[in-house]
């Protein structure tokens, strides 16, 4: 039997945590090399970002949720996990990303190089440094149900599932909407973000980034990318358009429509290449997965207490792919020496 092809899913803002994926650092060669490449590309800031990621500093948890740390590290970890999969000799049939995860998908599909991605991440961090305090709110309701309840600059920031919507906007306005929703018995919880991602609030702050994207040699994807910006496959024209990427932080994430299209086009094994297993939880609700035509395999644990769980989860995922009929190569091992990691996660 021909095995179901794999598709890689990359999570975005809200999934981050200190030491995400760190159990593969110093253990998997491709993952380690990619993370080190990112830290090198970050220049003088790289060592500090690395230490914050590994929990070697006294960085408060809430500061890790800020764009300055969360976005570059989510991008780095996603690219590192994707390259670790490619290093096993496994070619994905499709890529899909949520928020910053779409930049990861574009990088692995060859739309842009890792070095350009890191530079653009630095540009995004700088552009959003002076943005007003923002918030995001996960709500157990459809976007249509929520539309009449939105106030001021609060908008739908993401459609994650038919009844799983993310709202975004200025922090005080989001809080008022949260109080109204809770008073009406609608389940909601704050997402881990200090910026109003995927709302027009950020438009003035990212307006100038089209110039930075324009300096990058953007290319058509060499692998199929299902764009959560479009809710559809990424076209060559969109991939090469600097304005498409510059505007991404201000536009809603249509993750469920994009996932729905992917799973309508083909039956796959969805590998979540990032922390938290949030996209895995969403994807398991899709009829194609619930009915067994497609499957979901996370590469990292949901809430690790020890860094060794990262390697255990990655190894279990590889074994699952073998059971599916794939023939992954032996994982590249880092020569003994290098990295001393703290044992426990927060």
Task: Give each language-model segment a name.
Residues 1-149, 187-196, 269-282, 298-303, ...:
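FabD-like malonyl-/acyl-CoA
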Residues 47-48, 179, 216, 325-346:
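Flexible, low-complexity inter-domain linkers and amphipathic docking helices that mediate domain-domain
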Residues 138, 186-272, 281, 307-315, ...:
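Acyltransferase
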Residues 143, 169-174:
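Helix N-cap motif at beta-to-alpha junctions
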Residues 146-162:
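Gly/Ser-centered flexible loop/linker motifs
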Residues 149-152, 174-185:
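Short amphipathic alpha-helices in soluble, non-transmembrane regions
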Residues 163-169:
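A generic structural motif
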Residues 290-300:
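Short hydrophobic/aromatic-enriched beta-strand-loop microsegments
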């Amino acid at each position: 039997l021909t095995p179901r092809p794999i598709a890689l899913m990359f999570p975005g803002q809200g999934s981050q945590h200190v030491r995400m994926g760190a159990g593969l650092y110093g253990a998997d060669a491709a993952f380690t090399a990619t993370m080190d490449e990112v830290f090198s590309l970050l220049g003088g800031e790289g060592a500090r970002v690395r230490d914050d990621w590994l929990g070697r500093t006294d960085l408060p948890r809430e500061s890790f949720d800020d764009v300055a740390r969360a976005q570059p590290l989510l991008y780095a970890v996603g690219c590192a996990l994707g390259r670790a999969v490619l290093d096993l000799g496994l070619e994905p049939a499709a890529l899909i990303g949520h928020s910053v995860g779409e930049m990861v998908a574009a990088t692995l599909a060859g739309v842009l190089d890792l070095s350009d991605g890191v530079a653009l991440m630095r540009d995004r961090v700088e552009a959003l440094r002076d943005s007003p305090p923002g918030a995001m709110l996960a709500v157990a309701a459809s976007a249509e149900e929520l539309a009449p309840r939105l106030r001021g600059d609060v908008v739908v920031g993401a459609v994650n599932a038919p009844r799983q919507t993310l709202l975004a906007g200025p922090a005080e306005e989001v809080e008022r909407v949260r109080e109204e929703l809770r008073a009406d018995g609608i389940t909601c919880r704050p997402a881990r973000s200090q910026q109003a991602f995927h709302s027009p609030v950020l438009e003035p702050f990212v307006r100038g980034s089209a110039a930075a994207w324009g300096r990058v040699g953007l290319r058509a994807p060499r692998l199929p990318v299902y764009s959560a910006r479009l809710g559809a496959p990424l076209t060559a024209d969109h991939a090469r358009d600097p304005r498409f990427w510059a505007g991404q932080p201000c536009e809603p994430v249509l993750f469920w429509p994009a996932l729905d299209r992917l799973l309508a086009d083909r039956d796959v094994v969805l590998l979540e290449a990032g922390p938290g297993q949030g996209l895995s939880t969403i994807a398991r609700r899709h009829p194609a997965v619930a009915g067994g035509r497609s499957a979901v395999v996370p590469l990292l644990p949901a809430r690790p207490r020890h860094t060794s769980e990262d390697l255990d989860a990655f190894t279990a995922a590889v074994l699952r792919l073998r059971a599916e009929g794939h023939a992954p190569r032996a994982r590249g091992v880092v020569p003994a020496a290098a990295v001393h990691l703290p044992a426990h996660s927060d």
